[in-house]
């Protein structure tokens, strides 16, 4: 019986990094097994770096010395001890990292990619949409010219937030500016480019509906988190008056919440995040629930390379896969070079086919990037926006 013999938890980052302030640090767990194999997992930060890191120490107490093949058992054991697991982002994120690393170990022990253990390859290439590409873009021409640079890289889908510094409410002027941006993107890039509208859960219901109705004519692929997350009942009214499909899910932490949203018709495209909703196996369960109600999957993927590799392994197996978020071409070099394995070419992700998650760590670089502290903070710009756009 192979067990987890040692656990190393790394906070990695580059002080002053501004390209993605919500992930200027990343959290990595390294599990070393009794046979010497190494598995990597990742937990998200999003202005929660230190509490998530401490929660990872709690998960370590449950997982260490256990048989990592027993994923269901180990997960349930932590669930038993963690009183607030179902509602604690810190707990679910920490647990997700260990679950992902366990799969990496299992795949390496068996000499096969994780996706082969989840049903095998259904999608050989995964269409990506660009995110993070529009830093410092404020005017329509800024968005269009930057998007054209990414089209040259092969991207055919772009997510962006055109709402600048509007929060809770948005007036006619703010709506007009957003419409001007989306209109320019549609007219300049054409109908064959998909536009994905990011709201970041910033609006109350009435204003979200006004925004959605104003943007319907541009036929977005989806509109993401149009309403404050705690105002979930407003989604019923939103969907009654807006035609664009609704996408959300990165703030939902368990399959039961996803089941409620999809079964009640509050969401069309589910953006679960493997690194805060209990990992790879739970992602498969969530995807199956979503598929049974005719929904599609477009996993949230805004942090680091281990998250991406884990997400792609699930994507490979899904019959209801729609599209995959990608920040890779907006990452700083340190994050891009930390792990190698998967690649993105001509706007599509491709895994390496190597055992486990299919990635290899640059451990020397990892040692150089060890960091202790919170993410970068700018009192004039919330952590969740793309830099230079909240003005």
UniProtKB/Swiss-Prot annotation:
Superkingdom of origin organism: Archaea
Pathway note: Carbohydrate acid metabolism; D-gluconate degradation
Gene Ontology MF term list: galactonate dehydratase activity; gluconate dehydratase activity; metal ion binding
Needed cofactors: Mg(2+)
Co-factor binding details: Binds 1 Mg(2+) ion per subunit.
Pfam families found in the cross-reference section: MR_MLE_C (PF13378), MR_MLE_N (PF02746)
Parts forming coiled coils: none
Keyword Magnesium set for record: yes
Protein name: D-gluconate/D-galactonate dehydratase
Annotated organism of origin: Picrophilus torridus (strain ATCC 700027 / DSM 9790 / JCM 10055 / NBRC 100828 / KAW 2/3)
